[in-house]
């Protein structure tokens, strides 16, 4: 995917669920010359739990799978609640963590709780991998710190202390 992004430059867009990008294309607000699917990249659809309780959430993990993960439900309760607040079952199934974070929307359902849990965005590009705190990744509405030749591979969440919790406000 990184090689294809370098090859096609600003004319390419990454796609997984497509719930945001396809709407923009239909409205003719986006017209990429190349769509690069990340659906076959191994590991992007996995939630990894480390021994210390920290999580790596692959960028292609669906909103539904994230919200149903046992550790997310028990320790990152507010994040599980945010997953349940999505507008439709179709969006929960098709929408991805990467899409929700990378579109930079101020209305992104996951971002507030990811900020509460001190998330870092994991990126991979030609120089290698880098980790960017989510609050620095979100530059302004619709703009993120991802470089044109980078792929978001996941989100890292530090462990949550036993007995602590954060919940999403009712919407």
Please give the residue ranges for each predicted region.
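C-terminal structural segment of proteins
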Residues: 2-171
